[in-house]
Regions:
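A conserved acidic beta->alpha catalytic loop
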Residues: 38-49, 98
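Short, well-formed alpha-helical segments that are part of the catalytic scaffolds
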Residues: 10-25
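Hydrophobic targeting segments
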Residues: 1-5, 21, 32-37, 225
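Short beta-strand/loop segment that forms part of the nucleotide-sugar
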Residues: 30-40, 66-68
Length: 236
């Protein structure tokens, strides 16, 4: 199992989440390899990332730091990190902000392994899960869901949740056609898996928005809308 945590100028938030994740991974019976994938952060963030990698390694030795040469986007660095273990049976990623806790991510990984099916975390209020987001992010979230459904016919309750685990063999069949480097890469990924005949299960997770996130609804909405149109055009 290869688990990737993408970061970009985010060593401060990684510090708390990463320590908790390292502890959770060390306690897990699963064979997991963890890669912190830096998406071309500024030079002043390189040393803190290396220090964090070393500190996490004291807790969980199977952690590595991958440094992309330049910033291309979350999708690009996750895909790049996934190529580092081309034989991995499972490929996963979890965002570094801690909105999805390490315990929740491990729950998803166990669910995937037990069911032998790809698993997507989804942000959804249920009797057992909590979902807290700001009003502006909520509007952006619901608007993107509607756009993805209308433009791509994407049948997924929450394509953007930052916690996914995929069967490695299924991903590798479609990896060569994935081009979106930014925040729409999840939608392109799921569309490609669907066209290839792959299936997945969707599991609600506890998700609590954390301060300091990179998503800016007003700034990012137009770019993500254009990305959905690009994905649809390439599918034709």
């Amino acid at each position: 199992i290869l688990l990737v945590t993408p970061v970009w100028n985010d060593s401060a938030r990684l510090a708390g989440f990463g320590a908790a994740l390292a502890t959770a991974l060390a306690d897990s019976p699963l064979s997991i390899h963890w890669i912190i994938a830096d998406d071309g952060s500024a030079a002043h963030d390189h040393a803190p990332l290396r220090d964090l990698r070393d500190a996490f390694g004291e807790i969980f030795p199977r952690v590595h730091l991958h440094m992309a040469e330049r910033h291309h986007g979350k999708g690009a660095v996750v895909r790049e990190a996934w190529t580092l273990r081309p034989d991995a049976a499972w490929l996963a990623f979890v965002d570094a902000d801690g909105s999805v806790t390490p315990a929740e991510m491990l729950r998803l990984i166990h669910a995937a392994v037990d069911s032998e099916m790809s698993v997507l975390g989804i942000r959804k209020r249920t009797a057992s899960t909590e979902f807290i987001e700001s009003p502006w992010r909520g509007i952006f979230h619901r608007g993107f869901l509607l756009a993805a459904h209308v433009i791509l016919d994407l049948q997924c309750e929450d394509p953007q949740c930052g916690a996914k685990i995929l069967r490695g063999s299924h991903y590798r069949r479609i990896a060569g056609g994935l081009l979106e480097n930014g925040l729409a890469f999840d939608s392109e990924l799921l569309c490609a898996l669907k066209r290839d005949g792959s299936t997945w299960s969707e599991i609600p997770v506890n998700w609590i928005e954390k301060p300091g996130g990179k998503v800016r609804p007003l700034r990012d909405a137009w770019g993500m809308f254009k990305a959905l149109l690009r994905i649809r055009k390439r599918r034709r």
